[in-house]
């Protein structure tokens, strides 16, 4: 299936990846889908901001803990792109994200069941943002097949792979307009 892509969003994705590479010369780009529960939860427009803030806090706590343990820590700045979509069949709101993290610390999502892995932190942060129990609803954070791509500064092939995978976030067909909520966002600086 071919999609129409928003060129402004594609440019913002490109700029975000380039900014991330300016900060960290070796990155892991990780795709994740965040779904909403069928139970009452905090699913307002600010849920994605709460998620990002919760994930940043977990990353910071993880790095501080590793430092206290005397382990080498590579300071990381979380860069990200997100898109809000509505399912084509059921029309249910969900989010797609690409997270960019320093590869020296996270070369993959890690063990999906381990709370201290990057995947575990993502699941916990999403449940925290929603205000739901992480033990019961952690499957709302979904990782597609082969969610991670590595890239390095001056690696045109890796850069193109990341942009091609991230194009999915810039597709127009499943966005809702006129709702007062943003359909797309990315980290700044």
Per-range role (PLM):
Residues 1-24, 103-189:
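Catalytic "initiation/cleavage/transfer" segments centered on a nucleophilic residue
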Residues 17-87:
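Signature for HUH/AEP ssDNA processing cores
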Residues 31, 94, 135-139:
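A structural signal for short, well-ordered beta-strand segments and their strand-loop junctions
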Residues 42, 64, 91, 104-111:
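Short, solvent-exposed secondary-structure capping/transition elements
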Residues 47-48, 98, 112-116:
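Short intrinsically disordered coil segments
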Residues 79-106:
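Histidine-centered divalent-metal-coordination microenvironment in nucleic-acid enzymes
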